[in-house]
Amino acid sequence: MKFKPLHDRVLIEVLDSSEKTAGGIIIPDTAQEKPQEGKVIAVGGGAKTEDGKLIPMDVKVGDKVLFGKWSGTEIKIDGKEYSIMKESDIMGISGK
């Protein structure tokens, strides 16, 4: 894949979240309030301050992250779906 996010944007592969309960009940998207989980595929170079200093990114390629269901913008690259968002939309880095 040839895609490089700019500034403080992050490209994330959204990992499948369970849409069924343990009893087999299907939960509609509108009722799922848990954050989404994804894997960081690419990161930008970081944002810049007003005086031009680079703010380094906290996430790196390979990190598993949590983010809100409605965060970012869905895009398709080479037939595969991803989400691109600002680093500030990411809630945190989950354990590996």
From Swiss-Prot:
Subcellular location: Cytoplasm
Alphabetized InterPro entries for the sequence: Chaperonin_GroES (IPR020818), Chaperonin_GroES_sf (IPR037124), Chaprnonin_Cpn10_CS (IPR018369), GroES-like_sf (IPR011032)
Keyword Chaperone in record: yes
Gene Ontology BP, a term: chaperone cofactor-dependent protein refolding
PROSITE patterns (alphabetical): CHAPERONINS_CPN10
A cellular component term, taken from the record's GO annotations: cytoplasm
Alphabetic keyword roster: Chaperone, Cytoplasm
Function summary: Together with the chaperonin GroEL, plays an essential role in assisting protein folding. The GroEL-GroES system forms a nano-cage that allows encapsulation of the non-native substrate proteins and provides a physical environment optimized to promote and accelerate protein folding. GroES binds to the apical surface of the GroEL ring, thereby capping the opening of the GroEL channel.
PANTHER family assigned: 10 KDA HEAT SHOCK PROTEIN, CO-CHAPERONIN GROES
Protein name: Co-chaperonin GroES
